[in-house]
């Protein structure tokens, strides 16, 4: 599983996310990208939905959403969607969807976790559907450094950035809302194009196209007969 841990008030999920802070976060443009890639009205399976910051705008755009997260505390914030409390790798709904969403850089993890996450995507995507994936961009891996962003009164800091190996970045995300403060320490793994293609192929998927100029979002499609 991803190497991460969190601190701060309230519930912290197994992967280090602070439920109270994630419930405050707005979207950062993700729903528009997903909507364009999935197609109007497509049913979406959202893996790792958190507190619904992307779920709710997708529903507003006309998508039926099944929202999956391992944290019941996160799912308690999700409205107007079918919710499933499960780990991604254990998910077996027996249904296929027009689009499966794997956001939040969940693909930038260790090889085994990436494999089981992509296999979950493949067994739930329709043959004529797509898998929409968010990854850390190549540029981010090359340039990531300590930084700070403020959005809607919330402060998001990245600090203690190190590169323990050529393909790894370790850092601490610090989140501040008023007098509350949380941290999430994590390690993330870079994928080059060949590694990405190989990971997709192993799961019965192939790259269709990149969705953003920086290649942080991509659309994959099933290899017919593979799942």
How does the language model describe each region?
Residues 1-50:
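Conserved class I S-adenosyl-L-methionine
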Residues 51-90:
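Class I SAM-dependent methyltransferase SAM/SAH-binding core
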Residues 92-100:
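A short acidic, Gly/Pro-enriched loop at the edge of an enzyme's catalytic core
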Residues 102-104:
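Residues lining the SAM
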Residues 132-195:
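SAM-dependent methyltransferase
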Residues 195, 199-227:
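C-terminal lobe and adjacent flexible extensions of AdoMet/dcAdoMet transferase-like proteins
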